Structures are given as C-alpha cells and as structure tokens.
Swiss-Prot record:
Entry GO terms, CC: cytosol
SUPFAM superfamilies documented for this protein: P-loop containing nucleoside triphosphate hydrolases
Catalysed conversion reaction: (7R,8S)-7,8-diammoniononanoate + CO2 + ATP = (4R,5S)-dethiobiotin + ADP + phosphate + 3 H(+)
Name of this chain's protein: ATP-dependent dethiobiotin synthetase BioD
Residue ranges that the Swiss-Prot or TrEMBL entry lists as coiled coil: none
Length: 229
C-alpha cells in the first residue's frame, strides 16, 4: 500500500487545500492518486449547502478517484456531530477497510482526517493516529505559520513519535504574501522540527483550477512525490 495520512495542527490551517495541492501535484507528475475522507462533518442537511471537502479537492486538483465515508450535517467534532444526527460513528475495521478498498497497486492514496490527529473519528475512541498506525502509513502535518504554531506542531510530532508513526513532513497551509518576523522565524524553526514539504500561498484555494495546478506543481519536490510510492 502507498497510503499517506494528512492531518492538521488545528482547525482552519488549510488541511483540505493542502490535500488538494498534493493530489494535484501528484497527478501532474503522472501518479495515480486517490483521496479518501473517512469522516466529514458540517455537510448540512440533505439537499442543502454545507461543507464537502472531497468536492472541493476534486474541483481544485482535477482528481476523480474520490472516496467519501461517513458524513454528518453539523459542523462539530465527529462524536458530537454523530450524536446530534442520531447516527453511529464507523468502527475501526470500517475505517481501515475503506482506505484499503480505495488503494491499488501503483496508486498513492491520500487520507484526510477530520480536525487534528487525536480527534475521535470512530467508535471506541479510534483516532486518525490509530488509523495511520494500523495502515503503517506516514503522516503529513499541515501547520499554520503564525504565533502558536511551534507548540502545536511539536505536540503533534510528539504524539506521532509516541506511537512510532513516521512523520512525512510539514506543509504550511497558508503562507502570507507579506510575512512578518514571527512567520519568517517560525518557518526556519519548523524546518528544524521536520522537513517542510511546501508552503502554500494564503488564499490559493480561491484561485482558478488552472492557476491552482501551476502553483501546486511547483510547490512540492518531484523527487519527494516519487518517493511516496
């Protein structure tokens, strides 16, 4: 299996856009890529308008192999969203089975979590870290550039190391057009914690798919992409 799990240090750090950028870069590099979103909250009522991360990833990345999982209307943590919907969370086996079903020989399968690394995604308090451990998959961490990111990032990396889950590196999800001293210093420090694989421009999720492809294709090192398979 060639599975890469993607998490974020916080809500709103750009995890979905980073997943789309990586998927787009892989596609441009000639890699067969699929994207899984095992648990999605905030989808809104049936027929209404809510968040749909996979639709956004498909629109931006030009990737068709999109695999949705369990969806809940309210924009809450999965446990709370499932309770409010009167629906069950998936079991560990269901989560793992979904990813394995999406993967294929020669394919890179990206798995985007919901929230951070230790947010409960399934029954019996299963987390994204548990999923990565079960799949023997590395984890790419999407981080913010500003104040607070060093502590959040270090805590996430420490949590991965505690369960011997390899970190595939960091992606800065929204690099400002005019970074200040904090952002510049943080970028250097983040690179000492783990390799920074890309720093995506803030607002890149709002550009056209053509521009998104151009930006994504140059954001990631092609040699690193090839090594993910």
């Amino acid at each position: 299996m060639s599975v890469l799990v993607i998490t974020g240090t916080d809500t709103g750090v750009g995890k979905t856009v980073a997943t789309a950028a990586l998927a787009c870069a892989a596609r441009v590099a000639g890699i067969d890529v699929a994207v899984c979103k095992p648990v999605q909250t905030g989808t809104g009522p049936v027929g209404g308008t809510g968040d749909d991360d996979l639709v956004e990833i498909g629109r931006l990345a030009g990737v068709d192999a999109l695999h949705p999982g369990w969806r809940y209307p309210d924009p809450l943590a999965p446990v709370a969203a499932a309770e409010r919907a009167g629906a069950a969370l998936p079991t560990r086996d269901e989560l793992i089975g979904m990813v394995r079903a999406a993967d294929a020989p020669g394919r890179l399968t990206l798995v985007e979590g919901a929230g951070g690394l230790l947010v409960e995604l399934g029954q019996d308090a299963v987390t994204l870290r548990d999923v990565a451990t079960e799949l023997d998959a590395p984890v790419l961490v999407v981080v913010a550039p500003g104040l607070g990111t060093l502590n959040h990032t270090a805590l996430t990396l420490e949590s991965l190391a505690a369960q011997h889950v390899p970190c595939a590196g960091l992606v800065i999800g929204a690099w400002p057009a005019q970074p200040g001293a904090a952002e510049i210093d943080n970028r250097d420090t983040l690179a000492r914690l783990a390799p920074v694989r890309a720093a995506l421009p803030a607002g890149v999720g709002s550009v056209s798919p053509v521009d998104f492809e151009r930006i994504s294709a140059t954001a990631f090192d092609p040699n690193w992409l090839a090594g993910l398979l």
